[in-house]
Amino acid sequence: MGFWQQILESRQIFLKIVHKFKLNSIKGFLSLFLVGVSLSVAIAACSGNGASDSSTSTDAGGSTAKPVSANNQDVRLTLVSFAVTKAAHDAIIPKFVEQWKKEHNQNVSFEQSYGGSGSQTRAVIDGLEADVVHLALGLDVDKIQKAGLISPGWEKEFPNNGVVSKSVAALITRSGNPKGLKTWADLAKDDVKLITADPKTSGIARWNFLALWNSAMKTGGGEQKALDFVTKVYKNVPILTKDAREATDIFAKRGQGDALINYENEIILAQQKGEKLDYIIPDVNISIDNPIAIVDKNVDKHKNREVAEGFVKYLYTPEAQQEFAKVGFRPVEETPQTKELASKYPKIKNLGTVQDYGGWDSIQKKFFEDGATFDKIQAKK
């Protein structure tokens, strides 16, 4: 029965009641009043049902959207990342929040934590309930996996083996490059002092070591040549600092050493802040790949997996990759949108990868475990 047909029939019933009862009697008046109240409730119920059946929502573009679910509650994500990604994420997150709201009619808020990749890894293992981690190297994600927080095979869940940002190694020199450093090989000269952190305690120092080893392997050398070369370089390291920040302080503030190895993106970001640096990007280099992963145990606890996956996928879009490129990271994939930004980076003729050396598990065992290659190199100093 239609809404207006119900109203007409109710009106006819009401008129019959009026005719039957005498309005001058109290009993008749009360009966009429109660019937009127019941009729009003019935009409209101009919009206409510009619409005519900035709309910839709319209977005800003004028298109009709599905009704919003009563369970479509606000969602919070916790992002834990290594320090130098902050500028990029600060630009990316509002864009993702806006897009998710438009497509899902759901509000998303973020809690963010930034710091050294190693310390962030330990914090997550010790109880920082990250939903998404963006770290400096895959070895750190593997540690969280081994702690039971991330499911095995995390690197296959997203494109590029889970790598969402990348850079290469850069060689910073003193102003004017007085030692005339041009390639990695120059670091083995007797009169050159290199400042770097200990690769057994620092993530960036592991990349530094791989850049040196890779340079020997990619220029026609074998394992023995690489070992001899890297041994000579580390003999030129006066002190191994505990982390990259301390290495930078010793080089920049204390004036020690002739060269410092750092990420290219860190140098670009420093230049954007007005710092003047002399540096070289060797054309034989290592791809410094920064992976991202969902912390499965935490998203299952927080029941926000869908949004976490949506955020990670958004980081691979041209819009997000542009923001990474603006602060010095190289795009993980060249697209028409990122091609212009990518053109500002020096070309790398021979680029090595972690996969060239068996992945992080193999690298850790071969080079950085107790008694492995790096300890043997240090024993020769």
What residues fall within each predicted segment?
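A conserved helix-loop-strand patch within extracytoplasmic ligand-binding domains
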Residues: 71, 145-218
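Short, low-complexity disordered leader/linker segments with a strong preference
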Residues: 1-74
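Ligand-binding cleft/hinge of the Venus flytrap
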Residues: 94-104, 185-249
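Early extracytoplasmic/lumenal segment of secretory-pathway proteins
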Residues: 46-147, 157-158
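Ligand-binding pocket segment of bilobal, Venus flytrap-like solute-binding proteins
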Residues: 219-284, 291
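Extracytoplasmic
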Residues: 72-74, 105-107, 119, 127-129, ...
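Extracellular/periplasmic juxtamembrane helices and adjacent flexible linkers that interface
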Residues: 48-52, 299-381
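Alpha-to-beta junction loops
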Residues: 127-133, 191-192, 253-259
